[in-house]
Amino acid sequence: MARTKQTARKSTGAKVPRKHIGSKQAHKQTPVSSSSGGVKKVHRFRPGTVALREIRKYQKSTDLLIRKLPFQRLVREIAQEFKTDLRFQSAAIGALQEASEAYLVGLFEDTNLCAIHAKRVTIMPKDIHLARRIRGERS
């Protein structure tokens, strides 16, 4: 199929009323060709735009990033290996979650710095290893 130039169309700004079709069967029988302009193209943002928006959103917020119940299940599962039938106060699990999220955010910040130092924008496992090694957590 040959390429053709598309001309800009002016928008009226008002919503066009839809044609009411009696049943789903009638809708399936009427083919809509893509060349007639009946099918609307799905809007997609450029790569990285949504990521930057999410970064700004999470930097503004102070709420917890991990959902509470999955974190609670993880804590109970890990504690089960040391002693069975342990009970936790909700404040204790909240404190564990605050501390672990603060640790992970700090680790990812250091990991990002390691990736930037290597002239990359993508973090890799070796960046995490280097960040932990510099911190003195792992030799």
From Swiss-Prot:
Keyword Phosphoprotein attached: yes
Positions with biased composition (Basic residues): 16-27
Residues found modified as N6-acetyllysine: 5, 10, 15, 19, 24, 28, 40, 60
PROSITE patterns registered for this protein in UniProt: HISTONE_H3_2
Subcellular location: Nucleus; Chromosome
Quaternary assembly: The nucleosome is a histone octamer containing two molecules each of H2A, H2B, H3 and H4 assembled in one H3-H4 heterotetramer and two H2A-H2B heterodimers. The octamer wraps approximately 147 bp of DNA.
Summary of the function given for this chain in its UniProt record: Core component of nucleosome. Nucleosomes wrap and compact DNA into chromatin, limiting DNA accessibility to the cellular machineries which require DNA as a template. Histones thereby play a central role in transcription regulation, DNA repair, DNA replication and chromosomal stability. DNA accessibility is regulated via a complex set of post-translational modifications of histones, also called histone code, and nucleosome remodeling.
Protein name in the entry: Histone H3.3 type a
Organism: Dictyostelium discoideum
Gene (UniProt): H3a
